[in-house]
Amino acid sequence: MNNKEIGKLGEDFTIDFLNKRGFIILERNYKVPLGEVDIIAQKGDLLIFIEVKTRRNLDFGIPAEAVDRTKQTRIKKIAELYISTKKPKFKKIRFDIMSIILSKSGKILDWEYLINAF
């Protein structure tokens, strides 16, 4: 399983997780020249930007640790661009992280959804 397949598996799991909890998926892999946001979703009056991090081991720490200040700043700038372009009408904006650990065979061993992560 390559990194792209691992990432897709994590995003698929996250979208299923969000749908089951009443989120509406607005965008998946929203790309602009500055970068990409994995998932943009809505729940009530919230617009939520979600970064999904999936790993097969903890050699480099827990997946959420990969969303460092630089990555957070980039996601916030992409969010500003999304809002200025799409002009969605939301009262609140939130940034969440889905952290997923897989077995070597690709099964989900553990996950954590971090609300308001940054």
UniProtKB/Swiss-Prot annotation:
SUPFAM superfamilies reported in the protein's UniProt record: Restriction endonuclease-like
Entries under InterPro entries matching the protein: Restrct_endonuc-II-like (IPR011335), tRNA_endonuc-like_dom_sf (IPR011856), UPF0102_YraN-like (IPR003509)
Pfam family, one: UPF0102
Entry-linked CDD domains: PoNe_Nuclease
One GO MF term attached to the UniProt entry: nucleic acid binding
Family, per entry: Belongs to the UPF0102 family.
This protein's name: UPF0102 protein DICTH_1420
Naturally occurring in which organism (per UniProt): Dictyoglomus thermophilum (strain ATCC 35947 / DSM 3960 / H-6-12)
